[in-house]
UniProtKB/Swiss-Prot annotation:
Its EC number is 3.5.3.4. This is Probable allantoicase. Pathway: Nitrogen metabolism; (S)-allantoin degradation; (S)-ureidoglycolate from allantoate (aminidohydrolase route): step 1/1. GO terms for molecular function: allantoicase activity. It catalyses: allantoate + H2O = (S)-ureidoglycolate + urea. It comes from the Eukaryota. GO terms for cellular component: cytosol; nucleus. InterPro entries: Allantoicase, Allantoicase_dom, Galactose-bd-like_sf. Utilization of purines as secondary nitrogen sources, when primary sources are limiting. Belongs to the allantoicase family. One of its GO terms (biological process) is purine nucleobase metabolic process.
Length: 342
C-alpha cells in the first residue's frame, strides 16, 4: 500500500469516522491475542491491545527501568526493526484503518512504523508467511495518536497483523479498525445473537457515552467491571432518555432480547424500551419509522434481564434501538433471532 492511499485523521475525526463504521479487530476485549514479538525487555507487548487508554505513573520504576504502559524494546537493535504479531479476535476481518498511539513515550518512542497483515484461517504465521503491506513505513512522533484511514480498503480478509517499528523504541497502543467478516450457519432457523460483534453487529450511533463506550454493549462475555459497559451522564431535565442504535450483523427475525446490567448497581436505568426497523441505510434517518418490539420494562441492578416473545417478530429487521429511561449504564445487549432469507 502506498503513502497516497493513507489519510491521517485527527483524534476527533477518527472517533467520528471509525465510531460509526468500524470496530477494533484486535482489542483484547474482542478476543485479540498477541502471539509473539521480537523483544519486549522494558514493557510487555501485551499492553498494546489493552482497550483502555494508556496511563502514566511518573517516577515509578521496576526492575528493568521506568514503568511504561505500552510495548518497549531494548536500545541499539541490530535488526532492521522490532515487531509484534497479533491475531484478530473474530474469525477474520476487513481492515479500514489503524492507530499507533505513542502517548507518554517521549524520547523512547518508535521513530517509524509499518503494518502488514495475513490471512491464515487454519493456523498462525511462520517464517514462510506471505505478509501483505497495509500501512507503509511512516514517521512516528512522540506522545500522540497516529491514526490512519485507508482510502482504498483492502479487499482481502485478514486473520493476523504484524506491527513493525524501526529500529526500536516504544508504542503505547495498537488499534486495527475494520469490519468483522461473519461466518453464519447454513440453517436459517439457527438461533443467533444477531447483534453480536462476532457476527458483524455494530453500534452505529448513541445519544451519549460519557462514562462508557457504546461499542462495549456487543462484546463477548459479561465484562470485568463497570468500565466495560455503556454508561451515560446523569440527566437533569424532566422527560430525558438516552438511546443507542445497533446495526445487526444480518437482517433477521427478532424473537428475544437480553439486557445485562452486570456491575451497574446504583446507576442502572429505571426502564428500557426496544424498537426495531428494516432499513437499507447504515444509520436510519430522523424520519425513520421505528416499531416497538419491547414496550417499557423495568430494569434492576447487576443482573441479566431476559425478554421473550417480542412484538413484531414476523417482520425482518436490520437495526435495533435501545432506549434507556432516563439514563444510566448497561453492560451488554443481546438480540436473539433467525436470519432472513435475503
Amino acid at each position: 500500500m502506498s503513502v497516497e492511499n493513507v489519510e491521517r485523521l485527527s483524534p476527533e475525526q477518527a472517533d467520528a469516522f471509525f465510531g460509526q463504521s468500524s470496530v477494533d479487530l484486535i482489542s483484547r476485549a474482542l478476543g485479540g491475542q498477541v502471539l509473539g514479538c521480537s523483544d519486549d525487555f522494558f514493557a510487555s507487548c501485551e499492553n498494546l491491545i489493552n482497550p483502555a487508554d494508556p496511563i502514566r505513573k511518573a517516577g515509578v520504576f521496576v526492575e528493568t527501568g521506568a514503568w511504561y504502559d505500552g510495548w518497549e524494546t531494548r536500545r541499539h537493535n541490530t535488526a532492521p526493526c522490532d515487531w509484534v504479531i497479533v491475531k484478530l479476535g473474530p474469525s477474520s476481518g476487513r481492515v479500514t484503518g489503524c492507530e499507533i498511539d505513542t502517548t507518554f513515550f517521549n524520547g523512547n518512542h518508535a521513530p517509524e512504523v509499518s503494518v502488514e497483515a495475513a490471512f491464515l484461517p487454519e493456523g498462525n504465521p511462520d517464517a514462510k508467511t506471505n505478509w501483505t503491506p497495509i500501512l507503509p513505513k511512516l514517521p512516528c512522533g512522540p506522545t500522540q495518536r497516529h491514526i490512519y484511514r485507508f482510502k482504498e480498503i483492502p479487499q482481502q480478509n485478514f486473520t493476523h497483523v504484524r506491527l513493525c517499528m524501526y529500529p526500536d523504541g516504544g508504542i503505547a497502543r495498537f488499534r486495527l479498525y475494520g469490519n468483522v467478516v461473519p461466518v453464519f450457519p447454513a440453517d436459517l432457523d439457527a438461533r443467533l445473537d444477531l447483534a453480536h460483534m462476532y457476527l458483524g453487529g455494530l453500534v452505529v450511533q448513541c445519544s451519549d457515552q460519557h462514562f462508557g463506550k457504546k461499542d462495549n454493549l456487543l462484546l463477548p462475555g459479561r465484562g470485568v467491571n463497570m468500565g466495560d459497559g455503556w454508561e451515560t451522564a446523569r440527566s437533569r431535565e424532566k422527560g430525558h432518555v438516552d438511546w443507542v442504535i445497533v446495526k445487526l450483523g444480518a437482517r433477521g427475525y427478532i424473537d428475544d432480547a437480553l439486557i445485562d446490567t452486570n456491575h451497574f448497581k446504583g446507576n442502572y436505568p429505571k426502564e428500557v424500551i426496544l424498537e426495531a426497523i428494516d432499513s437499507p441505510d447504515h444509520i436510519p434517518g430522523p424520519d425513520a419509522q421505528w416499531v416497538t418490539i419491547l414496550p417499557a420494562r423495568k430494569l434492576g441492578p447487576h443482573m441479566e434481564h431476559v425478554f421473550t416473545n417480542l412484538q413484531n417478530n414476523s417482520t425482518p429487521m436490520t437495526h435495533v434501538r435501545m432506549i434507556i429511561i432516563p439514563d444510566g449504564g448497561v453492560k451488554r445487549l443481546r438480540i436473539y433471532g433467525r436470519r432472513a432469507a435475503n
